[in-house]
Structure formats: C-alpha cells, structure tokens
Curated annotation (Swiss-Prot):
Record flagged with keyword Transcription regulation: yes
Taxonomic lineage of the native organism: Eukaryota, Fungi, Dikarya, Ascomycota, Pezizomycotina
Pfam assignment, any one: TFIIA_gamma_N
Key words, A-Z: Nucleus, Transcription, Transcription regulation
Entry GO MF terms: RNA polymerase II core promoter sequence-specific DNA binding; RNA polymerase II general transcription initiation factor activity; TBP-class protein binding
Similarity comment: Belongs to the TFIIA subunit 2 family.
Function field: TFIIA is a component of the transcription machinery of RNA polymerase II and plays an important role in transcriptional activation. TFIIA in a complex with tbp mediates transcriptional activity.
GO biological process, one term: positive regulation of transcription initiation by RNA polymerase II
Organism: Emericella nidulans (strain FGSC A4 / ATCC 38163 / CBS 112.46 / NRRL 194 / M139) (Aspergillus nidulans)
GO cellular component: transcription factor TFIIA complex
Subunit comment: TFIIA is a heterodimer composed of the large toa1 and the small toa2 subunits.
Protein name: Transcription initiation factor IIA subunit 2
Protein location: Nucleus
Gene that encodes the chain: toa2
Entries under InterPro entries matching the protein: TFIIA_a-hlx, TFIIA_b-brl, TFIIA_gsu, TFIIA_gsu_C, TFIIA_gsu_N
Amino acid sequence: MSAQAYYELYRGSSLGLSLTDTLDDLINEGRIEPQLAMKILSTFDRVITEVLADKVRTRLTFKGHLDTYRFCDEVWTFLIKDVNFKLDNQQTISADKVKIVSCNSKRPGEA
C-alpha cells in the first residue's frame, strides 16, 4: 500500500489549529511522541480531504473585488475584498476580506 500525500491546507483551519495545539501540549507533557503527532496530522490531512469531497453538497456563489492573485507551485491564491456570499437557502453573508487557496486534486507528478 503506497502512502498518498495530501495537502496540509486544512491544518490552518480552526479545527486543524486546535488539533495541532492539542498535539503540541501532549508532546510537551511527554504523553505522546512527536512521530505519533505527525501520523495523526497525516491522518487528519487525508480524512478531512475525503470527508469534504464526499459529504459537502451545499453550493454558494460569491461576488467581490479581486485584490491580489498568485499562482505558485500549482497552487492558486486569491485575495478578495468586500465579498458577498449567497448560500443555497438564499442567505447572504458578507466579509471584508477573503483568502481562497485552490489546488489540483492531485499533486504534480501524480498519475
């Protein structure tokens, strides 16, 4: 069984940051080894990617002013200002700034 590499994007989410903080605390207290923490984070990367791809079906549209965009290492980054999101249920949510990171579902070089 070959280990597929997953992007680590979701480690920067509130859930990922909480997990990382908790793992750091456990390492500092000597309750787990750093290698176990890395295995847990790798599992988190895989599971959150699979769950979001399989379970999330809500659609939204958004409109805003594109401030900055970048394309580096097969990853697009968009910084958008004055954004309005419109959800499936017609609810509207506004934000001053939004950062969108978009990458291929497969890493470069993967079949």
